[in-house]
Amino acid sequence: DYTTSTPEICYDDPARLDFNFLAGSPPFSIDYSINAINQTPLTLNGSGNQQYTITPAPTVGLNSYDVIKVTDGNGCESVPNPSNASILVNPTPEVNITVSGVNPICEGQNSELFFPVLSGTPPFNVNYLAGGSALSTNIDGTGNQTTGGPMIISPTTTTTYTLTSLTDSKGCTNTLSN
């Protein structure tokens, strides 16, 4: 048997191929391809359930893994059924933070924060700092809050807004350093 325990992952998460060797003698050599490009054969030394973590991680999008043949330690060949597994890799979510209204503002005025979406699957949970205070909001695919419209801000002192992390609806997270 041949499957994957990770049919949908986030970019840079481990992708795994699962094999269940019911017959034959280890070690098992597996000739396979990724998206129709032949790869260096894998060697798995055990029998029964075996797992292989794909390195490097697959690219963003749908990746097809086809087993061409399995050769056991005695030279006996077979092709598993099914012989194909697919892994969907979701992109790392990315947004910017911009002031879309008046900047700078005077005391008593307000402005708008907007979060232009660059990649990922909406809605998003955005964590940010406002003058050192940790806050969060949910945004849609257009960069507005899911409650509608941009975020209205009216700080009473000069305030710096900094994105710290972003998580999309697929659970993919981007921890930001700036």
For each feature predicted by the language model, list its residue ranges.
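Short, solvent-exposed loop/linker segments at the N-terminal edge
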Residues: T6-D13, N103-Q109
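Short beta-strand elements bearing conserved aromatic residues within extracellular beta-rich modules
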Residues: F28-Y32, F124-Y128
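Solvent-exposed segments in extracellular or luminal domains encompassing
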Residues: T43-Y65, N138-T162
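Terminal edge beta-strands and adjacent linker/stalk segments
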Residues: G75-T92, G171-N178
